[in-house]
């Protein structure tokens, strides 16, 4: 079991209202963030996760490193979706949050969602990546939506990589859930490999309330996605009839 402290960076820029991922880029990210948090926490009893946003024109730490699912869930409530994303600034702030972790034995990892155009200079990003490597910070990037970012992000990961500890996963729009696709990727495999075979990664015998909360949350998410898919189908049919 890997002992890690992980900062998760969610892109809440205005690009996240796009509906090319089910039901939107932003909601698809949130679903995946929940999955990553629970899998990380269940992978090791001393693992911790923190949460940041990188949109709204300024990165913001929503939750410092914690194992408290309630605190983490509350931090994601009513997040604004606006402005532009500051990827580089977000990485730097996340690294500082990891640097001040209480348990220095924990390995450091950043999991960043990027779903809007990268505005930073690529040379500066590569310098930042090398600094992350020097400070032993592993980075995973979940890239959605904006294909023009892929080259810059790949160069960033290449510069940050050490012993294949960093990953870039670019996921095009798909009828499948983003969380499922991430789960099947190298990022997901790294998280899930040592996980027990309990639904949602939680043993209900150890934490009944958490298992029930996850079950209800996933049921609500599935219902919302079904409504969104039905609405999209009806709108498409109406357009065809009008033509």
Swiss-Prot record:
InterPro entries: PSMD4, UIM_dom, VWF_A, vWFA_dom_sf
Function statement: Protects ubiquitin chains against dissambly by deubiquitinating enzymes thereby promoting protein degradation.
Annotated region described as Disordered, given as residue ranges: 223-243
Biased amino acid composition, Basic and acidic residues: 232-243
Compartment list: Nucleus
CDD domains on file: VWA_26S_proteasome_subunit
PANTHER family: 26S PROTEASOME NON-ATPASE REGULATORY SUBUNIT 4
Protein keywords: Nucleus, Proteasome, Ubl conjugation pathway
Gene Ontology BP, a term: proteasome-mediated ubiquitin-dependent protein catabolic process
Originating gene: rpn10
Domain spans labelled VWFA: 5-185
Quaternary state and interactors: The 26S proteasome is composed of a core protease, known as the 20S proteasome, capped at one or both ends by the 19S regulatory complex (RC). The RC is composed of at least 18 different subunits in two subcomplexes, the base and the lid, which form the portions proximal and distal to the 20S proteolytic core, respectively. Interacts with uch2.
One CC-aspect GO term: nucleus
Protein family membership: Belongs to the proteasome subunit S5A family.
This protein's name: 26S proteasome regulatory subunit rpn10
GO function terms (MF aspect): K48-linked polyubiquitin modification-dependent protein binding
Nucleus recorded as keyword: yes
Residues of the UIM domain: 205-224
Organism: Schizosaccharomyces pombe (strain 972 / ATCC 24843)
